[in-house]
């Protein structure tokens, strides 16, 4: 799937409720929000400032969160479960990073954390140009630039 028509929008009651119902197949079911209340996702104060959804053709195709920590922009995301495993994750990542950079007028490095065991996501991040930085407990950190971290 191409994500070229996707637009980053602030979460709303409707999109947050929809994302909370997403169900991933094993072994990715650890990312399910079903029956696991997520206080951060439901925190309306962060909608449009830290939390967004990617909308394409009037459908929620992704969830994006971002925080600036020590002048580093950290991004997290989830792609709609029905779109996962098709080899298009890197296109989703590229679209989300493009939209975040535009929204925040940000030209610096972007950082992501991912479970080291989530090889599907790791492949997508690498294909999108992110480079391994270091291990952080059971997660690995990637950046879109090679640098000392």
Regions inferred by a protein language model and the residue ranges of each:
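Conserved N-terminal entry element of GNAT/NAT acetyltransferase domains
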Residues: 1-14, 148-149
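Conserved SAM-binding loop
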Residues: 8, 85, 114
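Acetyl-CoA-dependent GNAT
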Residues: 13-76, 80-84, 99, 103
């Amino acid at each position: 799937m191409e994500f070229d028509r996707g637009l980053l929008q602030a979460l709303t009651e409707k999109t947050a409720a929809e994302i909370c119902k997403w169900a991933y197949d094993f072994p990715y079911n650890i990312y399910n929000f079903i029956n696991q209340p997520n206080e951060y996702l439901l925190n309306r104060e962060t909608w449009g400032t830290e939390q967004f959804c990617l909308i394409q053709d009037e459908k929620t195709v992704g969830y994006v969160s971002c925080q600036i920590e020590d002048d580093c922009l950290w991004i997290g995301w989830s792609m709609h479960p029905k779109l996962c495993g098709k080899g298009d994750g890197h296109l989703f990542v590229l679209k989300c990073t493009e939209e975040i950079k535009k929204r925040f007028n940000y030209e610096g490095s972007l950082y992501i954390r991912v479970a080291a065991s989530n090889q599907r996501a790791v492949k997508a991040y690498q294909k999108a140009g992110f480079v391994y930085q270091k291990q952080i407990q059971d997660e690995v950190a990637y950046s879109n630039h090679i640098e000392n971290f």
